[in-house]
């Protein structure tokens, strides 16, 4: 699932260190997807359905099943991840819980069969063959370059974190009980066939994962087989279960998921604190104290609810005329945890500025625009009440692919720059122009103009054209 979901497990062999990056490129030939842009990638992923049709009729509304009889696409899907890939992965140091789970659905419940510490391929294969266990591999984009390439483009397209998990299930077995997720799900069938059953949501657009009892979910509203090259989409909250029928080969599919905690409710929570902060500067009513002992009351008082209702109406009126919304966490959280740009080489172009040094007479343009956010926040280096606003630019060019979606909060750091609020208009010029002359930037002095573009160039955010 997207969003820093920390895998659980009892890895006791020396706290596992972050895995080293590997390139396990599959021999699937040229890509069957169009990577020219984020939108072209998504369009090719859901082909032949048109993007407009998808968002009008299916997104957050109902499942979409795309069954294809395309050998080339089936071969490409099969190159994304195979059961046999686990052997080379395990040789690099994979841990139960963190990287891999072994489980099986028994009497409607998930039974976890993990061992402690490192996962060894022979043990995984033994549990797979003898116990009919499903192998779940967490976030394979950390190691499989083509999944990195796909998910990086999808994160640009959705503006939301995109995670993935691989599920490998032997014949005559089911890994997970009926459940629903808190994410939008795209299933790509990679190997073998899988039997799927989908049910009406009990909680539409659910915000939490939950297992559902068979007797509560009724009869499936959709039932079908997925074959290599097929794609299935369903909204968060859709109850589902899947099994590999007896007598067939094992099944491998990858679940690509997004839009966790990315609702209007989440955005409201994220922006309202900044709105209150700004309004309180101008509205003395918001700065007056609450009644004595209000916090000691068991129930909300009529006075408190009436005052809060009035304040919310004031905030709504102010919001109507506001152009700048202060995002406190969502922007930073996304850009800080997302994948870095896909790079077929060593990634040097993302860490070392190249090309000409920008000068006053240069023409510059933004690069990696989908990997940068610009936001206005109170100065985080000031602790007093008179915090000035600053312009913050955060980017994901130096993010770690190896820790993507793995919940390593203590290892996460911001990458970016900070500028005075007076630089906002000039930065917007750079953001909104295909290319712009440095001397035309809306800053007072030539020194400020050169200093601004040099700072951006040093972070590999602009190039001279």
Curated annotation (Swiss-Prot):
One Gene Ontology biological process: ribosome biogenesis
Induction comment: Up-regulated in response to MYC, in alveolar macrophages from coal miners and in silica particle-treated A549 lung cancer cells.
GO cellular component: cytosol; nucleolus; nucleoplasm; transcription regulator complex
PROSITE patterns: JMJC
Tissue: Expressed in liver, skeletal muscle, heart, pancreas, and placenta. Not detected in brain, lung or kidney. Expressed in several lung cancer tissues, but is barely detected in the adjacent non-cancerous tissues. Also highly expressed in several esophageal squamous cell carcinoma (ESCC), and colon cancer tissues, and in various cancer cell lines.
Cited InterPro entries: JmjC_dom, NO66-like, ROXA-like_wH
Top-level EC class: oxidoreductase
Cofactor binding annotation: Binds 1 Fe(2+) ion per subunit.
UniProt-annotated location(s): Nucleus; Nucleus, Nucleolus
Keyword list, A-Z: Dioxygenase, Iron, Metal-binding, Nucleus, Oxidoreductase, Phosphoprotein, Ribosome biogenesis, Transcription, Transcription regulation
GO molecular-function terms, A-Z: histone demethylase activity; histone H3K36 demethylase activity; histone H3K4 demethylase activity; identical protein binding; metal ion binding; peptidyl-histidine dioxygenase activity; transcription corepressor activity
Modified residues (Phosphoserine): 309
Positions contributing to Fe cation binding: 179, 181, 240
The protein's Enzyme Commission number: 1.14.11.79
Cofactor requirements of the protein: Fe(2+)
UniProt keyword Membrane, yes or no: no
Catalyzed chemical reaction(s): L-histidyl-[protein] + 2-oxoglutarate + O2 = (3S)-3-hydroxy-L-histidyl-[protein] + succinate + CO2; L-histidyl-[ribosomal protein uL15] + 2-oxoglutarate + O2 = (3S)-3-hydroxy-L-histidyl-[ribosomal protein uL15] + succinate + CO2
Annotated phenotype, changing residue 179 to Y: Abolishes demethylase activity
Domain JmjC: 139-271
Task performed by this protein: Oxygenase that can act as both a histone lysine demethylase and a ribosomal histidine hydroxylase. Is involved in the demethylation of trimethylated 'Lys-9' on histone H3 (H3K9me3), leading to an increase in ribosomal RNA expression. Also catalyzes the hydroxylation of 60S ribosomal protein L27a on 'His-39'. May play an important role in cell growth and survival. May be involved in ribosome biogenesis, most likely during the assembly process of pre-ribosomal particles.
Protein family: Belongs to the ROX family. MINA53 subfamily.
Protein name: Ribosomal oxygenase 2
Species whose genome carries this gene: Homo sapiens (Human)
């Amino acid at each position: 699932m997207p969003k820093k979901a920390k895998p659980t497990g009892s890895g006791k062999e020396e706290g596992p260190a972050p895995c080293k990056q590997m390139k396990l490129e599959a021999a699937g030939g040229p890509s069957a997807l169009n990577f020219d842009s984020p939108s072209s990638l998504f369009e090719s992923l859901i082909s032949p359905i048109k993007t407009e049709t998808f968002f009008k009729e299916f997104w957050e509304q109902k499942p979409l099943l795309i069954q294809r009889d395309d050998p080339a696409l089936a071969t490409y899907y099969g190159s994304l991840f195979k059961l046999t890939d686990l052997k080379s992965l395990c040789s690099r140091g994979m841990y139960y819980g963190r990287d891999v789970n072994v489980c099986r659905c028994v009497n409607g419940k998930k039974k976890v069969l993990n061992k402690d510490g490192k996962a060894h391929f022979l043990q995984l294969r033994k549990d797979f063959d003898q116990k009919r266990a499903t192998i779940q591999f967490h976030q394979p984009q950390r190691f499989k370059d083509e999944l990195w390439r796909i998910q990086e483009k999808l994160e640009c397209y959705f503006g939301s974190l995109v995670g993935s998990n691989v599920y490998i299930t032997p014949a005559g077995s089911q890994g997970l009980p009926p459940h629903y997720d808190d994410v939008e799900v795209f299933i790509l069938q990679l190997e073998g066939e899988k039997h799927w059953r989908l049910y009406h949501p009990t909680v539409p657009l659910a915000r939490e994962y939950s297992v559902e009892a068979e007797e509560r979910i009724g009869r499936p509203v959709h039932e079908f087989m997925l074959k290599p090259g097929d794609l299935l989409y369903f909204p968060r909250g859709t109850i589902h279960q899947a099994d590999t029928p007896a007598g067939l080969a094992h099944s491998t599919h990858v679940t690509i998921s997004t839009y966790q905690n990315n609702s209007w409710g989440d955005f409201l929570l994220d922006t309202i604190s900044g709105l209150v902060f700004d309004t309180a500067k101008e509205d003395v009513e918001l700065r007056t104290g609450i009644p004595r002992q209000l916090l000691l009351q068991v129930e909300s008082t009529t006075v408190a609810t009436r005052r809060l209702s009035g304040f919310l109406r004031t905030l709504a009126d102010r919001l109507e005329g506001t152009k700048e919304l202060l995002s406190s966490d969502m922007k930073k959280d996304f850009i800080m945890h997302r994948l870095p740009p896909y790079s077929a080489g060593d990634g040097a172009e993302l860490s070392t500025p190249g090309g000409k040094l920008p000068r006053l007479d240069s023409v510059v343009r933004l690069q990696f625009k989908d990997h940068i956010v610009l936001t206005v926040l109170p100065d985080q280096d000031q602790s007093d009440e008179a915090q000035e606003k600053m312009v913050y630019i955060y980017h994901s060019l130096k993010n770690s692919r190896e820790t993507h979606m793995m919940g390593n909060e203590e290892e996460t750091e911001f990458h970016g720059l900070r500028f005075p609020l007076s630089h906002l208009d000039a930065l917007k010029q750079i953001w909104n122009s295909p290319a712009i002359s440095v001397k035309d930037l809306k800053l007072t002095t030539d020194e400020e103009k050169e200093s601004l573009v040099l700072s951006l160039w040093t972070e590999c955010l602009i190039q001279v054209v």
